[in-house]
Amino acid sequence: MGLLIEGQWHDQWYDTGAGGRFKRENAQRRNWITADGSAGPSGEGGFAAEAGRYHLYVSLACPWAHRTLILRSLKGLEPLIDVSVVSWLMRENGWTFDTEHGSSGDALDGFAFLHQRYTQDDPAYTGRVTVPLLWDKQQQRIVSNESAEIIRMFNSAFDGITGNCLLYTSPSPRD
């Protein structure tokens, strides 16, 4: 899996631990969807819960992405938040929208690679290109690429629209 450096894709593996162990880095895009669009615990405000405004990118090979799909279903958000699935087969360009290998294709812009969505948000982005990714179609920006925060948003931000006020996650991270 490669990464973007100043908006350019580099086909190189990112660092692992000395013993080859995977080191998960913190997500870099940490905005929040809230019922009224006010700022959440991190990031900027301006992301109000609205039907049809957001798009979720996932890989069915990623457990962190799976939990966003589970909360999307439990909270009845399927009609409100559409989804694109990247291919399970990661190649030299990272996550792809290769429909011959399990992808749904990019439903928004027909991109070939997920890294194109990251550079649409920030042409000089440096970092890993990860799923899940929550995209704001109105502002043409990444809301978040942190699964724990995405599920917290899904857990309560849209309750006023769906009427589903059941809570499935803790409201805030544990220390």
Predicted regions and their residues:
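Extended catalytic-interface subdomain
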Residues: V129-V131, R141, N145
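Local sequence-structure signature of Cys/Sec-based thiol-disulfide redox active-site neighborhoods
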Residues: F47-L89
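Structural micro-motif
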Residues: F111-L133
